[in-house]
Swiss-Prot record:
Keywords: Ribonucleoprotein, Ribosomal protein, RNA-binding, rRNA-binding. InterPro entries: Ribosomal_uL11, Ribosomal_uL11_C, Ribosomal_uL11_C_sf, Ribosomal_uL11_CS. GO terms for molecular function: large ribosomal subunit rRNA binding; structural constituent of ribosome. It holds the Pfam family Ribosomal_L11. Belongs to the universal ribosomal protein uL11 family. GO terms for cellular component: large ribosomal subunit. The lineage of its organism: Archaea, Thermoproteota, Thermoprotei, Desulfurococcales, Desulfurococcaceae. Part of the ribosomal stalk of the 50S ribosomal subunit. Interacts with L10 and the large rRNA to form the base of the stalk. L10 forms an elongated spine to which L12 dimers bind in a sequential fashion forming a multimeric L10(L12)X complex. The gene is rpl11. This is Large ribosomal subunit protein uL11. Forms part of the ribosomal stalk which helps the ribosome interact with GTP-bound translation factors. One of its GO terms (biological process) is translation.
Length: 108
C-alpha cells in the first residue's frame, strides 16, 4: 500500500452503511435489510465512479442497483430490478439529469 493512500469502501460497504446494517441479507430475495431513496443510489454511483467501468451516470446507477439487490436493499420501497427497468424506461431521467454535472466533475 502506498503511504498516505486510503482504502476506499466497497459498494456493498457503502450500501450497508446507508441502511445502517452490519451485514448483507443471507436471502436477499425474501429478506430485506433496508430501503434507500433513489437519490442515495445516485450519490453512491458518483462516489464510486473511479472504481466503475460505467461510462454514464445511468449505467453506474444500474450497477449500484444490482449490488443493492444482491444484498437485500430495496430502493424507494421496490425491488432494485424493478427500479432498473424504470431507469431504462426513463422514469428517473429528471433525477439523473439533476446529478449529471456532479457525475462529470467526479474523478474517474
Amino acid at each position: 500500500m502506498v503511504k498516505g493512500s486510503q482504502v476506499k469502501p466497497s459498494t456493498t460497504e457503502l450500501l450497508l452503511k446507508a441502511v445502517s446494517a452490519k451485514a448483507p441479507s443471507g436471502d436477499p430475495i425474501h429478506q430485506k435489510i433496508g430501503d434507500l431513496p433513489f437519490e442515495k443510489i445516485v450519490e453512491i454511483a458518483i462516489e464510486k465512479k473511479p472504481d466503475l467501468l460505467a461510462k454514464t451516470l445511468k449505467a453506474a446507477v444500474k450497477t449500484i442497483l444490482g449490488s443493492a439487490r444482491s444484498i437485500g436493499v430495496t430502493v424507494d420501497g421496490k425491488d432494485p430490478k424493478e427500479v432498473t427497468r424504470q431507469v431504462d424506461e426513463g422514469v428517473y431521467d429528471a433525477v439523473l439529469a439533476k446529478y449529471e454535472e456532479k457525475w462529470e466533475e467526479a474523478e474517474g
